[in-house]
């Protein structure tokens, strides 16, 4: 039992962070305090403030503290620890994806593209956007308004004539000399930059001036092009403006809570435009106040530096925060400029907070409906299989094209549905092409032939396939030499049947040695179809990426002595990869930088 008196006798009154551990030496809670002794003493009073705190204190076996120089430093360290340890009594933001941006590169002929992750590429970044779909939509729009290139540099550097994008008026073809001057191209780049910065009126003023000058010079064809561009830009501006009032860069955060589920809805506004919105469903311990939830969300959301998120000038929330000053100070330090958190909004901005609140309520209602349905599906599957409680399910599928670029996927469901952070793909190598049994065996060994934490052991493993695939899976598990209980998972084959029609699947249950055909309206079948389809889609998308990578590689990458510059020279002088393949050894040797010996090596590699 934890001796709180003995522990508290050695705690100082400094600011800092504390970590509470249970009997398994797992961090169960992380907190911070401006006075560690005072804060930690409050946990061991006779009358605790909530059942959540009572349950937490009952689980404590030891506590560690870290002294910091300030409250701000403690706040940052607290969020780093929460991110690292994922304690069960803390509010946890489960979405861990970095946000996508639009990147305008810094080159002679800049390109515009999407970017996610660390900002290593030199250029200007615009965003963040709430999801990849918003970036794709904006890029498509920009291409229609301002015809600048979006192609990769490898494509740009090796073109001898303009591509289809030039033919349909979506690129000025800077890749081929004589089609557009650097000045004209960079003018369109400037328009795109101003547009992304929200300076739409400047874009219009420039275009109107160009149109009028072309008209005065009797160049009516050029004037008509500018007129069409002006109309397109005006049409977009009318749709994108939030209001006539110019708004600061801001995020608006609203929270809805019901039946143990919280929805945090974020509305992103940049340069006076709504870039989009997104709903989050953090894991919230019982009896957590919504103010605490908001504070924790803001901290985790903006202080995870590796996410590449931009901190806006203003963050608007729908409730008062106790740690508002500390959060503002920390976010200001992180951003390198003044950041304000506003919790008492009036006037025009209040209607956007109301909009965020409406969206939070709507998203929560949908989530509750889906959670209820998933619960019913789990309940029916548990009854069908005679399992008291299903906590975790995993499903495997194989994807390839004619035995090439084989990928195996593993998707994971918990009681709330898909657990995408645990999804995995496996490259399958060293097998006969098209041997799905061998591919499944390799995938299962990669997944399970290692130590697993107790909560990571699945209750059910679905194998997308018939008896053959299931028998191969059983063989793998029989041969596993692992410490965890390999007999716990139920291995179930999902066979499509003779007609391979959806709804006519046969379940082959290994432990019960029986086969089941469920009716089309079975909730258990719907759950199985959901996880099977997720696995199928995950495998196909991974296979397509691998196939596309193989397709786009020239075949020169693996030849020793052929680096990026020599590869580029070969493609340029011989007219692309087909020209390289058709070239004789002497023709290859005539390319600058390619010796006779290297030409022989290249020729042999491509033809043998």
UniProtKB/Swiss-Prot annotation:
One of its GO terms (biological process) is nucleotide-excision repair. Residues 201-236 form the UVR domain. Gene3D superfamilies: 5' to 3' exonuclease, C-terminal subdomain (1.10.150.20), GIY-YIG endonuclease (3.40.1440.10), UVR domain (4.10.860.10), UvrC, RNAse H endonuclease domain (3.30.420.340). Transmembrane segments: none annotated. GO terms for cellular component: cytoplasm; excinuclease repair complex. InterPro entries: GIY-YIG_endonuc (IPR000305), GIY-YIG_endonuc_sf (IPR035901), GIY-YIG_UvrC_Cho (IPR047296), Hlx-hairpin-Hlx_DNA-bd_motif (IPR003583), RuvA_2-like (IPR010994), UVR_dom (IPR001943), UVR_dom_sf (IPR036876), UvrABC_protein_C (IPR050066). It comes from the Bacteria. Keywords: Cytoplasm, DNA damage, DNA excision, DNA repair, Excision nuclease, SOS response. It is found in: Cytoplasm. GO terms for molecular function: DNA binding; excinuclease ABC activity. Pfam families: GIY-YIG (PF01541), HHH_5 (PF14520), UVR (PF02151), UvrC_RNaseH (PF22920), UvrC_RNaseH_dom (PF08459). Residues 13-91 form the GIY-YIG domain. Belongs to the UvrC family. HAMAP family: UvrC. The UvrABC repair system catalyzes the recognition and processing of DNA lesions. UvrC both incises the 5' and 3' sides of the lesion. The N-terminal half is responsible for the 3' incision and the C-terminal half is responsible for the 5' incision. Interacts with UvrB in an incision complex. This is UvrABC system protein C. It comes from Mannheimia succiniciproducens (strain KCTC 0769BP / MBEL55E).
